Amino acid sequence: DVVANFFMGRELTSTRLGLRWLREAEMEEVTRQALVDIGTRIPNVRSKVGTLSGGQRQAIELCRFVHFGGRLVLLDEPFAALGVAQTRRGLELVEAVKRRGVAVIVITHNVLHALQVADRIVVMRQGRIVGERRREETGHDEIVALITGG
């Protein structure tokens, strides 16, 4: 479920009478609050992760990363398999993660996505950097020209 996925390898436990017990209620509340803090809504944190949308699963991963102190996240084509609404939500999540002081590197072939979330855009062609621009100093046409060599 979502709680088990969120705490994977970091479960909260107590020891009583020599036995370790999971602090399920506390883990559930921490998970719920962490999701709220980053702006993600999952109706039931006891839902099986496999029943959630791709966007919801990505949100859980990002939320877990931020909650446990991650400082840099690398997202490789994070929106490739998502629908329009899920992609919009994913872009919002990237912005939320950035606002929390986490550095985010997004690898994408979608110029519009890059322009929406990037502070800097680095264009590579055939394994070489062919251009680097600050988002506020460039636009769609210039980035496409760098990509295509035009």
Name the predicted role of every residue range:
Residues 1-150:
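Glycine-rich phosphate-binding loops of nucleotide-dependent enzymes
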